[in-house]
Amino acid sequence: MAEPSPSEELASQVNGVYYLTGIRWKNNEPSLRVQIDGAPSTVLVEARGLNLRFRTDVEKPGRCLGRIERSVEGSSYVECLSPSTRGRRCERCQVIENVSAANMHQAHRKGRDSIDQRMAEYLSHPHRLYVAIFRDGSTKVGTTRGSDGGQRLVEQGAWFAKYVAHVEDGFLVRELEDVVSKSINLGQAVDTRKKFAGHLRGQRNSELETTLKDLTFEVEKVLQTQERDGWVSLDE
């Protein structure tokens, strides 16, 4: 007899307590990362077509969302079974996340020798520079690790996007990102609440595509002024 799938198992335990700790994207398909109260590890549940009906158990403490570790191999999720004490994470995971984020986003200013070795190895890998637009018309410039872009744009929730440069590593790509941001006043982040709200009052696709095309043209003009080695233009 076949074992029940994770979603069937969750559905059968209607009185159980579950912690939704994140979403994992693989091959452009989303899965929910779920912890079952008392279980030793995380279960991945396919999200496409999943119907969720739940009650919030106010008597139970929140659960830490875990953290992301980065190394030469890429990014990996580290689960944590501790209660959340600082926002959505436990104190230890939050401190590690804060240090990791500071090292990653300030690496090009701090220098390779001034950040954690594992982060330096993570960044010593080809990256891409992209321009993205979201459903409400919000725009940003961003970076993603890997020669093919990976799952980053899907994770970000971009409605449309263009890759504008292939860069030799994560240090140089962030220098280019900063140049673009300062030159045309283009932000590097969009609030998650705006991303969600945009699906309720989204702009027409034709409007978004036109805005992105015009913005990409401006970004490309900025990049053409950068006479340095280590990157090439993209139009993808």
Model region roles, listed by residue range:
Residues 1-236:
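Non-catalytic accessory segments flanking enzymatic or RNA/DNA-binding domains
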